[in-house]
Curated annotation (Swiss-Prot):
Transfers the gamma-phosphate of ATP to the 4'-position of a tetraacyldisaccharide 1-phosphate intermediate (termed DS-1-P) to form tetraacyldisaccharide 1,4'-bis-phosphate (lipid IVA). Keywords: ATP-binding, Kinase, Lipid A biosynthesis, Lipid biosynthesis, Lipid metabolism, Nucleotide-binding, Transferase. ATP binds at T56, V57, G58, G59, V60, G61, K62, T63. Its EC number is 2.7.1.130. NCBIfam families: lpxK (TIGR00682). The keyword Electron transport does not apply. GO terms for biological process: lipid A biosynthetic process; lipopolysaccharide core region biosynthetic process. One of its GO terms (cellular component) is plasma membrane. It comes from Legionella pneumophila (strain Paris). This is Tetraacyldisaccharide 4'-kinase.
Length: 323
């Protein structure tokens, strides 16, 4: 996302007011689309479908939350599967079940990361109903989580969870193109849970992304932060790199930032010319396994939510009888 667009969406740039008429037109279109798809095209399923999505453009921390929810479901002894779009995946035949030895270029960075962190099937398809049917046909799953897909209204859902960035929140509050909203903020009143990443607000639940030990990519060994007493290169190809940079600062690591577009497919030449040790996000690291070296490291994070969320989650009527 360009710096200029950020100024319009998350600042008070005068151009936003010129775009407001188009935002109102966009609101009409998406409301009509949602009504039509829910009424005439939505497919319902015999098991709970949990959608973890957002109402804004850009990264908000959905994938770590999906991973944490999947782990909690498994701890209850339930079989869970995950569906994802597979954004920028090179593969053309869908649905496709992600394999641990797949490349991020083939299946997408987030699906590959989830498959490697959770012992459950992860299936990608731009048409999420195809992925859901695949899981129902090929695996005896009891609950399905959709990573993103809040606006994919052809897919029925039992629970909707929206994640909001606690730093950027809803920006200027306008829908596209004047603001960052995919849907009006009134949509938040219709979902089951609103989770604020690194923040809190009335009627929402708070989530923290807890940094774990830094890992050397080539050997997968954990290393101490004391290894990075001098400056490093912080490389990020994610929707909101500022959060990653802030985390490194909180850990006392000095760095030079190297920002790339979200879902950037890293190549060796992106990193070869950097003479410093490189620390990146785990999502970016899965794209670099084929050319890993001893100078490449990544910082895993883990989503943490308080007990009040989990009590409300497991008390939801759509999950009654599933634990």
């Amino acid at each position: 996302m360009s710096f200029f667009v950020n100024r319009i969406w998350y600042g008070n740039h005068f151009l936003q007011w010129m775009l407001v008429p188009f935002s109102w037109l966009y609101r009409i279109v998406i409301r009509t689309r949602r009504w039509y798809l829910q009424r005439f095209c939505q497919q319902l399923y015999p098991i709970p479908i949990i959608v973890v999505g957002n109402v804004t453009v850009g990264g908000v921390g959905k994938t770590p939350l999906v991973i944490e929810i999947a782990k909690k479901i498994q701890q209850k002894g339930l079989k869970v599967g995950i569906v994802s779009r597979g954004y920028k995946a090179a593969i053309k035949h869908f649905p496709y079940e992600v394999k641990l030895n797949d490349s991020a270029e083939l299946v997408g960075d987030e699906p590959l990361m989830m498959a490697r962190k959770i012992n459950c099937p992860v299936v990608i398809a731009p048409k999420r109903n195809e992925a859901v049917r695949y899981l129902l046909d090929k695996h005896s799953v009891e609950i399905i989580i959709s990573d993103d897909g809040l606006q994919h209204y052809k897919m029925g859902r039992s629970i909707e969870i929206v994640v909001i960035d606690g730093m950027r929140k809803l920006g200027n509050g306008f829908c596209l193109p004047a603001g960052p909203l995919r849907e009006p903020d009134s949509r938040l009143k219709q979902v089951d849970f609103v989770i604020v990443n690194q923040g809190a607000a009335e009627g929402t639940y708070s989530m923290e992304l807890i940094p774990k030990n830094i890992v050397r990519l080539s050997t997968q060994e954990e290393v101490s932060n004391d290894l990075f007493t001098s400056e490093v290169a912080a490389v990020a190809g994610i929707g909101n790199p500022q959060r990653f940079y802030s985390t490194l600062s909180q850990l006392g690591i000095k760095f030079n930032p190297y920002s790339y577009p979200d879902h950037h497919q890293f190549k060796p030449h992106d990193l070869n010319d950097i003479d410093l040790p490189v620390i990146m996000t785990e999502k970016d690291a899965v794209k670099c396994y084929s050319f890993s070296s001893d100078k490449l490291y990544y910082l895993p994070v883990e989503a943490k939510l308080n007990d009040s969320f989990w009590e409300a989650f497991w008390s939801h009527q759509q999950l009654q009888g599933y634990y």
